[in-house]
Amino acid sequence: MNKKDILNLLSKLNFPKDEFYVLSGASLVIRGIRDEAQDLDLCISKELFNQIKDTYNLTDDKKNECNFYHINDSLEIVVDNKAQFNMEVAEPYNLEDLHTILDFKKKRNKPKDQVDILKI
């Protein structure tokens, strides 16, 4: 997914801006640090989760080992308390804190992470 694809999907979702933020690779694409991401990962508030869980049929069996709900091949979400959101307020959408992404990538240290580490 390139930046246009990500922004189009976010627009279609039409989630309230203050109830979610864009995670990891997709946030790097929006920032212009990376050209593409495999999918869009979002952290959403418990309040937003309660509003959308029936629409997207979000049941525990749709969670992966990292507690992300798989909605489709392009979108996964994880739920957190708004008070614990680790984000940077940005336009047009809030993004995961860059230092958090960098720390995660340094710890995981896959080949694709090494490329991102140099660019961040």
Give the location of each predicted region.
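Compositionally biased terminal segments of proteins
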Residues: M1-I120
